Amino acid sequence: MAAEVVFKGTAFPESLRWHNGDLWFSDVLAGVVYRGDVTTGQLHIEAEIAPYVSGLGWLSSGELLIVDCEKRAVVQLGSDGKLSMHADLKSHWSFNANDMHVDVDNTVWIGTYGYNPESDSPVPADLARISNGNIDFPISGLVFANGIARIDAQKIVVAETFADRISVIQTSGEVKLLKQIHLPNNSTPDGLVVDNQGFAWVALAYAEAILRVNLETGEMVRAIEIPGRGVYDCTFGGPNLDKLYVATSDTDETHVMRDLPGEILCFDLGLTHPGVRGLGNK
């Protein structure tokens, strides 16, 4: 499938969000949050959080929430450009905070590394919920919880990168794990998004593809191949939410700050998957 390169010259783009006609994302290792105009290719710096930044989401009042990975916190970007604390998770977690999802009622769901993936064996950890100023941990046992997307009003799906699986979680009423869908070995699922037909589009970080997964049956197909690239996130965008934007970079993170190989690609699904659109709920 042919792709258009819409943005280039970043280090490690992730946390893609389509918001108010622009594509927002985090350049994780550069500690920068960008807003991108997909028409002109212009990137605008909206926030800088050293050394690492991850998940993005908006409150109903319009303020942007950002994950400060190393401080293990969610911070809020004010209209004056200043950052303030929204939720501090440092006393709860020993390792970096990761991606998150913000619901329409301002509830935040956020994961943590849970261990050092460069030196340690995988260790399960909790998924945090932040609601009305309160922090709790209703789900445990997730291995490197990463991308989070809402399926519907009752459920979210979470990528567990180093367990090679995605987990469907009930969020209404009693929060509980509903199912785990195991992906092929070494899939390393990272960011994900859900379409209007009940499928998750999952970025496979080190497997060079986007996997489309039926969340009811577990059936899956490699929908998009991106040879030679790390594939770190995807989201729907465009006026009709029928374009898939994909964050890619080099898989060797040791030189991405020097070489800036990060690119965001756009795939027109109207040509290959007619009728498939995003839900606008990432």
Regions found by a protein language model. Give the residues of each.
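A short helix->beta-strand "capping" segment at the edge of beta-propeller domains
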Residues: 1-9, 38, 269-270, 277-282
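A short beta-strand motif characteristic of beta-propeller blades
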Residues: 2-7, 41-48, 83-90, 134-140, ...
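Beta-rich, blade/repeat-based domains predominating
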Residues: 7-21, 49-68, 91-114, 124-126, ...
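Residue-level marker for isolated small/hydroxyl-bearing positions within beta-strands
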Residues: 26, 67, 111, 159, ...
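Short, solvent-exposed loop/turn segments at conserved positions within beta-propeller repeat blades
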Residues: 28-29, 69-70, 117-125, 161-163, ...
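A short loop-to-beta-strand structural motif that recurs across blades of beta-propeller domains
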Residues: 32-34, 73-75, 125-128, 165-167, ...
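Short loop/turn segments that connect beta-strands within beta-propeller blades
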Residues: 37-41, 78-82, 130-134, 170-174, ...
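Blade-level signature of beta-propeller repeat domains, shared across WD40, Kelch, NHL, RCC1
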Residues: 235-282
